[in-house]
C-alpha cells in the first residue's frame, strides 16, 4: 500500500537493463548489411563524436574501459619499479590495470563519510616511484580535481619521468577512471577533458552502452603530437600491426609491419553502431537520470538515509548510480533489506566491497583493517535501481517499498 492508501501491484524491476531503441537495432543491422563488422568507419565516427562531446581533440575506442586504462599506463611507460595510487573503495578494474603493467598498487583510503580518496593520505603516499594517480569518479560524480592537481604540483620535486610523455607532463600523471562518469562535468568542463588521461566504460550496465567497450580521451600535452598518441594506441590495440583492416582495403595495400608484440583490444563497428545511436539520444538520457535522482532525493530526505550529492554549482554528475547508506545497521541487516526488496520485485546492489577485502588483493598483502573508512562505507550501503527504462510508476514503487522496509531498521 502506498502513502495514498492505494494498493500497489508487485512489479519486476531490474537493477540496470540496457536502454535499447529501434535506433540501436537499425545501426547494428546497417553495420551487418554493410559487410564491415570489425573496426572501421563506424568506430572512427564514434571516436570523433566522443572527442567532440568530451571537448578534446582525439579519442580512441577500445573493447573496454579496462583496456583503455591499461593502455594509458602503457603510453606513459609505467611498469616494473613504478607505483600508482588507487582508492581502496572501487571496482577491481581501477587497480588491476596497475598489476597488468607490472607496477605496484598503492591503495589510499577514502575520506570519512565520503567516497573520494583522502587527499591528505594521497599526498603522504606519493614517493619518487609514483608515476600516476587513478582517481575514480564513482557513481558518476567527479572527484575534486583541483585538489588532486594541486597535490601533484606540490610533489613535482619528487617526480622522475620514465619516457618522453611523462617528461612533457612534468609531474605525476592523472589517469581518471571515469567508467561511471561519461557526460559528467567539473567546473564547466566535461569529464574527459580534465585529467591527463580519462577512461570511460560502455559496458552493458553503463549510462551509454556499446554492449562491451570503452573510450580513452586525453588532454593536449605540450610538445607531444596527439596523432602520435593516437597511432601508438592503435598499435597497442591491434597486435602492433602497422595497418588496421580498413587501411588494408586500399588498392595493393596488403603489406603491413608488426611494430611490437602487443595486444588485441579494438572495438568493432557493430558495437560502435550501438554507441552512435546511444550518443544521439544521450542528452535526453542524462536528463531522465537527473529527474529520477531528484525524485529519490526528495523522497528520502526524511528517511534518515545518507545519499550522494549529484548536482552542485561545482560539478554535474552523470547520474550513473544511486547509492544510499543506512547508518547503524549491520551487514546482516543490510542483507535482509536487499532480500526484502528482492521479494518486492526490486533488484538492488552494493557498490562496492572494498578491494582489500577481495581474495586477489589479500593475496597481494592488503588488509581491510588499514582502510577503516572504506569498510564503514561498505557495511551499510545499498544501491537502488537508476536507469532510463524506469517509468515514473516504477520509481514511485521503489520509493514506497524502500521507505517501508528501511523504516523497520531506523
Identify the residue ranges that each predicted region occupies:
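N-terminal "arm"/small-domain region of PLP-dependent enzymes with the aminotransferase-like
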Residues: 1-36, 41, 257-259, 385
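Active-site PLP attachment segment
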Residues: 180, 193-243, 269
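Hydrophobic "lid"/C-terminal helical patch
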Residues: 28, 32, 72, 398, ...
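Hydrophobic/aromatic ligand-binding patch that stacks against planar heteroaromatic rings
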Residues: 96-98, 190, 270
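Phosphate-binding glycine-rich loop
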Residues: 36-83, 97-99, 107, 156-160
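Conserved active-site segment immediately N-terminal to the catalytic lysine
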Residues: 162-209, 254-258, 306-307
Amino acid at each position: 500500500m502506498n502513502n495514498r492508501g492505494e494498493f500497489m501491484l508487485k512489479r519486476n524491476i531490474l537493477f540496470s537493463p540496457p536502454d535499447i531503441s529501434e535506433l540501436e537495432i537499425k545501426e547494428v543491422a546497417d553495420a551487418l548489411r554493410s559487410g564491415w563488422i570489425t573496426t572501421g568507419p563506424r568506430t572512427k565516427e564514434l571516436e570523433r563524436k566522443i572527442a567532440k562531446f568530451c571537448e578534446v581533440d582525439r579519442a580512441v575506442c577500445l573493447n573496454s574501459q579496462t583496456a583503455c586504462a591499461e593502455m594509458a599506463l602503457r603510453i606513459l611507460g609505467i611498469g616494473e619499479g613504478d607505483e600508482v595510487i588507487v582508492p581502496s573503495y572501487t571496482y577491481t578494474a581501477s587497480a588491476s590495470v596497475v598489476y597488468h603493467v607490472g607496477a605496484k598498487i598503492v591503495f589510499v583510503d577514502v575520506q570519512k563519510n565520503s567516497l573520494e580518496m583522502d587527499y591528505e593520505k594521497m599526498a603522504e603516499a606519493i614517493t619518487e616511484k609514483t608515476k600516476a594517480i587513478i582517481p575514480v569518479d564513482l557513481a558518476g560524480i567527479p572527484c575534486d580535481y583541483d585538489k588532486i592537481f594541486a597535490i601533484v604540483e606540490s610533489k613535482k620535486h619528487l617526480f622522475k619521468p620514465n619516457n618522453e610523455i611523462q617528461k612533457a607532463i612534468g609531474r605525476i600523471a592523472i589517469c581518471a577512471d571515469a567508467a561511471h562518469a561519461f557526460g559528467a562535468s567539473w567546473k564547466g568542463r566535461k569529464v574527459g577533458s580534465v585529467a591527463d588521461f580519462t577512461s570511460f566504460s560502455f559496458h552493458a550496465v553503463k549510462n551509454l552502452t556499446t554492449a562491451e567497450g570503452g573510450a580513452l580521451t586525453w588532454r593536449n600535452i605540450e610538445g607531444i603530437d596527439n596523432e602520435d598518441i593516437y597511432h601508438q594506441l592503435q598499435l597497442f590495440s591491434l597486435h602492433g600491426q602497422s595497418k588496421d583492416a580498413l587501411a588494408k582495403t586500399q588498392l595493393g595495400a596488403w603489406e603491413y609491419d608488426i611494430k611490437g608484440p602487443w595486444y588485441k583490444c579494438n572495438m568493432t563497428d557493430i558495437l560502435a553502431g550501438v554507441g552512435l545511436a546511444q550518443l544521439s539520444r544521450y542528452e535526453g538520457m542524462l536528463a531522465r537520470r537527473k529527474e529520477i535522482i531528484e525524485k529519490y532525493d526528495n523522497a528520502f530526505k526524511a528517511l534518515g538515509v545518507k545519499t550522494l550529492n549529484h548536482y552542485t554549482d561545482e560539478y554535474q554528475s552523470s547520474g550513473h548510480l544511486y547509492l544510499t547508506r543506512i547508518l547503524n545497521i549491520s551487514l546482516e541487516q543490510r542483507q535482509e533489506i536487499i532480500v526484502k526488496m528482492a521479494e518486492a520485485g526490486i533488484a538492488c546492489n552494493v557498490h562496492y566491497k572494498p578491494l582489500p577485502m577481495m581474495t586477489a588483493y589479500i593475496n597481494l598483502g592488503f588488509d581491510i583493517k588499514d582502510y577503516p573508512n572504506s569498510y564503514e562505507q561498505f557495511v551499510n550501503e545499498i544501491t537502488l535501481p537508476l536507469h532510463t527504462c524506469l517509468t515514473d510508476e516504477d520509481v514511485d514503487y521503489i520509493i514506497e517499498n524502500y521507505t517501508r522496509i528501511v523504516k523497520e531498521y531506523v
